[in-house]
């Protein structure tokens, strides 16, 4: 069967969709945000493919696998086992790294265990165990006729007279020994100074090198090795011999200091195994510590609350500081930064063993005196963090924690022995610290000879292939030791994609969710090459995507629409890209064919050179002393290839600087920089990112945007509610009173099933409505509170048209393209892009002062061309009110409408971190060194035509 037949798909908003998709092709599903693309791809095709596969397993196996709900569809034929690769960030486990997720690290461990050469950490001498035959061969390879002696080093740098050693040697029939570098007959050895360290080597044999000595040498070596615990020396008898002293070892041990290592095993290189993990940080690579910079506000005095929790409101702690100040003679009324270094040290780290006389005023007004050392603010926090059993206290104290690389392993996570094993000229931590692109080149050029070459051949092939796949999906700037929880959703998805290609499966249905997120146009071509490679292996690749290049490259395109939410859920057009382009009803087709387009502004808003935000000397992560200038009151786009430093510059430097100064944020970490100028032009900063608006099913757009409070007030104002004495709290599902107590306002009850997935069944008391019967009897304009929460934003906008406060907030949700989501939709079901737009609408609905800095990170995630047009209207509206809008973006349709561009590069990772171009889009398009300009130029020319 060469087709996938879908009949009667009704999942979510799909309207009885019938669709026939070709197998083993690259299929792109596109359409407006909320039109039903994910419902078709993930909730219908993937859910059914995965469910059928899991159902084929035994009941015992099924209990370990989560099973998906059966989608609402009549029939699906021609399905393969399905693998979904979504944007969810991979792991919040601090032990997961890029290397471990892609399994490259497992192969590297195997490589180092099988062909690595351990070296002594102190003397840098290879710890290679040699057989007696190898030792004999090495000696016989020396110039023939060389006069040599074979020594057994029985004492190494040890104090004493060692008389017993000499007696033992004589008893065994030995005649000579080398003591502290001088040769003596055993009967003539001078008395040794027992206070000094000595070295004693017994002469086991003396010989001239010639070919027939094999047997004799072998026996002599065995004698020497047994005497000196596996170590032997060959030294010239005369100083004029042209032979250097050679050390031989029969075990993995340093011949100089005796540092030994057991046989190399892969677990020695695992930081998740006690055998390999650094004992100081347990393989995490970082140590947490209470950071004085986070605890203290140095501009305030101790009396004003320089240290949170130790001010006048906390009488007990403040009295302690008062007694401390009296003892050491400093003032509580002086800014903390101006106190002497000694006084600061005492406050932060304690008085050591020195007793301080403390005076406390107890509840009865009596003065109590005690004398004891002062613990210190930071040790006090550490102790409380360690001892507390309260999650709230721990969470509060965690705000003062910072991390630093482990002082022992320097962030490599491995124990000392594992850090000193070499393959070629690199250790394992050196390879994992390289960007993937460089590691790929290194692995390609690594050639091992002989037995090692044979052992390493297969392992190296796997490593090279997997590194190449990461390069192909545009991740050449990542390092293998990068922690997985620092990856963006797009990066995590492309890592999974690379792992899947590495698996080399055939006959599978892959379903991907916007793999081009966070990718620069230049890297996009490589990603599309990867997708076609997956297809060419013999797989069906289904991609939910808005990227123009991906749609044009597809074998088959499905356009879902025509609108969003209830107005969507139908197949508007399907076929080859050309067929969709020429379809009269396809919105996607209109944008692809150029009948509709996102226009370039006729003229750019000029910048005022006197009104600039100036950031100097930014050098976080890979930034190379960058000086950034952002025009105030304009729409600025920060562009650059993936990994060039955009997020570090804006999210980790510009945002925390401005948020700390304008919003009073206290716990944000700022990447290193020299100076910042221009705060006088701003009064607040708003960061609109893609983190969830809430992590529980109780959070929803209505609660987040502040709509729910006025809605509850409306309901409590209904005559029936007033006569019953219901206040706004009655209509909250988070507190007792009006909610259904059987499900505590959740509307569903979780039922744990053992070998089936946990199921959530509608509460049989309230039938999923969250409220009790009495609350639901109150109606506003004929609707209950439950029915209002079930409305889409569009329906609610019409319903509350006469209530200006609500209408305005609902209109802003419509303006950012969220007309299709429900007011009470659980926050956990919103995508990153949707969550970001809910946040944007909340900011839009506030009265703006025209002096706000808005920062957005890739707001076009999940947006169709028509949605992008809506978003741009909103961003330009903010700009027209005098606000400063800074957007990190790869989408060329957004970039071309910006007033000002700042392009970072030239490449990603260590080859990036510089501003290579800034100016208007037209100016950047003419700059040959800018990758962004290269792709922008033809677009501007086409749109101006």
From Swiss-Prot:
Domain of life: Bacteria
InterPro entries: ABC_transporter-like_ATP-bd, ABC_transporter-like_CS, ATP_grasp_subdomain_1, P-loop_NTPase, UvrA, UvrA_DNA-bd, UvrA_inter
Quaternary structure note: Forms a heterotetramer with UvrB during the search for lesions.
Family to which the UniProt record says this protein belongs: Belongs to the ABC transporter superfamily. UvrA family.
Zinc fingers (C4-type) by residue: 254-281, 740-766
Protein name as annotated: UvrABC system protein A
Subcellular location as annotated: Cytoplasm
Any GO MF annotation of the entry: DNA binding
Gene transcribed to yield this protein: uvrA
Entry annotated with the keyword DNA-binding: yes
Functional description taken from the UniProt entry: The UvrABC repair system catalyzes the recognition and processing of DNA lesions. UvrA is an ATPase and a DNA-binding protein. A damage recognition complex composed of 2 UvrA and 2 UvrB subunits scans DNA for abnormalities. When the presence of a lesion has been verified by UvrB, the UvrA molecules dissociate.
Keyword match Transmembrane helix: no
